[in-house]
Regions:
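N-terminal, charge-rich interaction modules
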Residues: 1-60, 64-67, 78, 179-181, ...
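Internal, well-folded beta-alpha domain core
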Residues: 71-190, 196-197
C-alpha cells in the first residue's frame, strides 16, 4: 500500500541531508534548516535534525552532560539506531553547548592517515550565528575570506581548534547550530581574527 507520509518524510530527510552537505561544502555561510522533529529539552530541533539526517546504526553519538537526558537518548535510539557513547574519544558525532565546546578538543576522534574521514563531527549549539566576535573563514569552498560572528565562542576556542586540526587531513569537523540555522566549519577551514589574514 502506498504510504504518502513515509514518502514525504523520506523526501524531507533527503533535503535536510543535502542542505547539511552544502553547509559543509560552503563553510561560513548560514543556512536555514527546516526541522524534521520537534525540540527535545535542551537539544534544538535543528540539532536533532542533523543527527536524524546523518546518523544511522553504524554511527555513534556522544551527549554532553546537559543533553544526556532519558528523553533525548530514547529519541536518538529510536530515530537513528545510533550507539550512544560515554567515551567521547570514540564518538562519530557529539552534541555540545558552545560554552563546553572548547574542553579537550584534542580528545575527539580525528581519523588516521589511511582513513581521515573516521573522525568526529561536533554539533555545537549557540544562540546566534551573526552576533558573536568577528573572525574570518578562508580555505576550500570559500572564494574570498568571509566574516563569521558565532555567539558564545571565545578566541581561545579557535586556537584550540587550530591545534586539534594541525595535522591535516586529520582533524575534527564542526557544525554550529541555532534553533533555525546551521553553519559548517570543516577541518580544512582556516579561521583567523580580523586583520590577521
Amino acid at each position: 500500500m502506498f504510504d504518502q507520509a513515509s514518502m514525504n518524510n523520506a523526501q524531507q530527510g533527503a533535503r535536510a541531508f543535502r542542505l547539511i552537505l552544502n553547509a559543509m561544502a560552503r563553510p561560513g555561510k548560514v543556512f536555514t534548516l527546516p526541522s524534521l522533529i520537534e525540540r527535545s529539552g535542551p537539544a534544538y530541533a535543528t540539532t536533532l535534525t542533523v543527527l536524524l539526517a546523518l546518523g544511522d546504526h553504524l554511527t555513534s553519538i556522544y551527549l554532553a552532560k546537559a543533553f544526556s537526558t532519558a528523553e533525548i537518548e530514547k529519541l536518538l535510539r529510536f530515530h537513528t539506531a545510533s550507539q550512544l557513547l560515554e567515551d567521547r574519544a570514540q564518538a562519530d558525532f557529539a552534541i555540545l553547548n558552545a560554552a563546553d565546546a572548547e574542553m579537550a578538543l584534542d580528545a575527539w576522534k580525528r581519523g588516521n592517515p589511511e582513513y581521515p574521514d573516521q573522525s568526529a563531527t561536533l554539533l555545537i549549539q549557540t544562540t546566534s550565528l551573526t552576533l558573536g566576535q568577528e573572525v574570518q573563514f578562508s580555505g576550500p569552498g570559500i572564494q574570498s575570506p568571509i566574516t563569521v560572528r558565532i555567539a558564545d565562542i571565545n578566541p581561545s576556542f579557535w586556537k584550540a581548534r587550530a591545534a586539534a586540526n594541525a595535522t591535516f587531513p586529520l582533524g575534527v569537523d564542526m557544525i554550529f547550530i541555532t534553533p533555525q540555522e546551521i553553519l559548517g566549519c570543516p577541518r580544512s577551514t582556516h579561521v583567523s581574527f580580523a586583520g590577521d589574514i
